[in-house]
Amino acid sequence: MMKTSKKFQKALFIFRRDLRLEDNTGLVFALEHAQEVILCFIFSPEQIEHNPYRSDHCLQFMIESLEDLEKEIIAKGGRLYLFYEKPEKIVAELIKKQHVDAVVVNRDYTPYSIKRDQKIDATCKKLGVSFCSFDDALLHFAFSIPGCRR
């Protein structure tokens, strides 16, 4: 029997709005293309600290959703790691300490999210790691629709 090798040794998959195991484009890619996948969620200071966009109800819903996701992952023999820091700092630390060679995410389209992903991509490039992002939450890529601008 022929042994198949995968493209990546260790991938980091970062959950964001996609708090599910089923029908998750980026997660499926990571599982199919990496020998090992680290699953994490990163609370950024902007989500937690008081600001005009923060909602206690939204934060509570996110925490409850993460608890449900963690139970699903544990039931499948995995682990969900939770972090609190600027995402690019966590990514850099995990790349160095865990020898991650790919960071995988599903795209998000808010101005904040686009800037966040640009910083993560720059961190990955600086450290020689692949950054893979996928359209997942929408039927059509957000900026492919006429009249939709960045």
List where the protein language model places each region.
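Trp/Phe/Arg-rich N-terminal binding region typifying the photolyase-homology
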Residues: 2-150
